[in-house]
Amino acid sequence: VNSKANNWRFLCCGIAILAFVSGCGNADNSSAGFVRFDDGTPVRSGSVEFRSVADGSRYASRIGTDGSFTLTDQDGEPRCPPGEYEIVVVQIVLTEDLAADAHQHGGTVPRRYADYYTSGLTTTRGVADTTPLLVTLATGDE
């Protein structure tokens, strides 16, 4: 009888661990992507935000120095559900105390991309879409 109880506990622990491990991470990468200028260079600093056209929910991320990002919801969970989105890219660069050759923020994002009304950036994610999100900004566009 005692060995049956131990087997049952072992099975329950195994199921719990399997459920925990399989729920971790974002295996489909549906919230990952890149922000680049139209000449192919990455946006090296700032943040990106996607706003759902359907319900206004927002998914945001900081932009890595290689232009990469992973969108998260307001609870910090990496995700970007299927749907249509408006996009903004915001970059605040504080450089008044630096010489021009010491700036490491890369190309400057034009101000119009920081506002949903002027950015003109949109995307649609399908249900099974796991391709990386790509946000492209026009260079020299003010």
Predicted regions and their residues:
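Sec-dependent bacterial lipoprotein signal peptides
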Residues: V1-S22
